[in-house]
Amino acid sequence: MNKVKLDNIIFGDSAIPFIGGPCVIESRDHCFGIAEKITEITSKLNIPFVFKSSFDKANRTSISSFRGDGLDAGLKILEEIKNNFNIPVTTDIHLPEHANAVSDVVDIIQIPAFLCRQTDLLVAAAQTGKVVNVKKGQFLSPYKVENIINKLEESGNKNILITERGNTFGFDSLVTDLKSIPIMQSFGYPVIFDATHSAQIPGNHESKTGGNRQFIPNQTFAAVSSGADGIFMEVHDDVDNALSDASTQWPIDKLENILTSIIAFRKTYLDHG
């Protein structure tokens, strides 16, 4: 497997990096508070950390849902967090023209699951030279991810991460088939597990996505035990009042406990997997 290096963070090595933060940038102060707390926890546990938050939630269920403050304001906040806490940052893009602007700030460009087959978007992200993290679509077989990887490689980029976030099962349900982790790893790149979006129930509510937060630990520990190379998790300090994905963001006051368990499961996998 190709190891993907990001400063002093290595995806595909023995340590299991953590990508986390609030689903959407709600405000500068809120993001700073979350970044500070996660930095404290991950430093204590010696877990490599990449801060994540979105400047625009472009695929909200309802047109009236909060989307964020937009590209310019969002990138300014992400840049401040990056410099203030000396941590790498990531965000997602939705249009090819976002790629160059975002690449001036972030260390990883994330491609949303719904857009994972959009060739122009993949090419634009790849051509920045940044690490590109593609979230596998809910509609996509893990075997088809090889086509996504080919698009990125043919665009000159081999700094690739793939994120598993479950597959649509019937109406309004997601199921994670953990065979997808080694299947996608077989294409040569690290695979991240999205612990929070995998717990979603799309369309569970009329105007917003629901979810089963209580199953996040079970699925996460199973994914780590299946060899996941990193964990993606959206976290919040007031989950019930979060402005996006309130049903599945993980409470920040429970983050240290779940990360401690992740470390233990990772050690067991490395020793016996």
Predicted regions and their residues:
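Glycine-rich, proline-tolerant flexible connector loops at the mouths of alpha/beta enzymes
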Residues: 22-31, 49-71, 236-246
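N-terminal amphipathic alpha-helix/helix-capping segment at the start of soluble metabolic enzymes
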Residues: 1-18, 76, 267-273
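Catalytic alpha/beta core domains of metabolic enzymes, predominantly
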Residues: 129, 133-235
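Alpha-helix-loop-beta-strand connector modules within alpha/beta enzyme cores
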Residues: 36-40, 44-45, 64-90, 125-131, ...
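N-terminal small/glycine-rich loop or linker at the start of catalytic domains
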Residues: 7-24, 54-64, 190-205
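Catalytic beta/alpha-barrel core
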Residues: 69-70, 84-98, 107-120, 131-142, ...
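Structural preference for beta-strand elements that scaffold enzyme active sites
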Residues: 15-19, 46-52, 86-90, 107-108, ...
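Active-site-adjacent loop and "lid" segments of alpha/beta metabolic enzymes
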Residues: 63-72, 85, 110-115, 171-175, ...
